Amino acid sequence: LFPLMTVGGVDTHQRAEDSTKRVFILTRSFFAGQQRYGANTWSGDVASSWESLRNQVPLCLNHTLTGNPNVNTDIGGFFAGAYNRAWGDNSAVSNPQFRELYTRWMQFGLFNPMMRSHGTDVYRELYYYGQPGEPVYDALVGAVKMRYRLLPYIYSTAYNVSVGDGSFMRALFMDFKDDKNTWDNNRQFMFGPSLLVCPVVDPLFTEEKIVRTDETSGWNKVGNDAVGGWPAVDWTQDKTYDVYLPAGADWYDYWTNEKYTGGHSISAPAPISHSPLFVKAGSILPMGEDMQYSGEKPWELVTLNLYPGADAEFTLYEDEGDNYNYLDGKFTLIPMRWNDRRRELTIDAVKGAFDGMPAERTFRVTTPDGKSRDVKYTGKRVTVKM
């Protein structure tokens, strides 16, 4: 009960101090009911290891199953000293074992309700991990860029979490309860209504480092046997990873647009640049432009990625971004519907208004077969034939 009362006190008193900014609470303590304050719980100061990364997936899913949708982890793990050559020398930024772990954790964190890189012992800033054109650096930057591009999808999902009792990270059996193969799948999950996330939680390019804890020093990780230079790794190798595609839907590989039938496992491409990601057929996936921070650009160009194979619905939510005016009705909803038989997308009239909302915007409608159409939207209903 103490975490609930503490978080509630922070929320109440901070809003009393300044109601023009939304309260932001990050906590490792949790009690039932805490979701009413929008507090985000993280999994604690976990070790930087593949074992820890594997455990984060079911941990996050179990947390959301309690009714609290807001959960995240320290990307890369918190205690990473075992990857350094010597205590505090930060050499782990060049250690291929940590580089691979950090990259895959970043690709998992991309699909957490909060994406947050944090830890000790090793610098986490991306510029320590190479330069543009180098595989690890490009993979890390690519994950961050995709997070920002997904903001229209994530923010709209957050609206559904708030008013529709939804969740960001969904255990597969929540959406595919008739498929027994999803019941104990603790390595994959749905992120929002459309994205099947398949994080790579095993090393594919390096050997797994077993991280142990010295009982005499507690959190100080030991067991580093690195001497001399780090071994060379060819990050351009083709790798694959086993993925289960739930029955009851067809699936598109997000990266290749190849279509698969659900109900079986496949070996999906898993290069260092990205982890396997699939989109459910019958989805509308809105994405924004490249941005450096969430409010850098208004949503004047939104790409609507259509994935045919079934009818689809999506409601795009938007508001002023950082205040409580939405509680007074200052927000907009743009319902969208895809008719698969007619190959038509209907974008309904905008509902609501808020200060600074775009007077018009462009929806770039795309399909996996490469078709693309730009549609000027002024708030009135429009139908697009694809």
Regions found by a protein language model. Name each.
Residues 279-381:
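Accessory, solvent-exposed terminal regions and/or long lumenal/extracellular loops of proteins
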Residues 1-274, 279-280:
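Catalytic-domain carbohydrate-binding cleft regions of carbohydrate-active enzymes
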Residues 236-238, 263, 377-386:
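Solvent-exposed, conformationally flexible loop/turn segments
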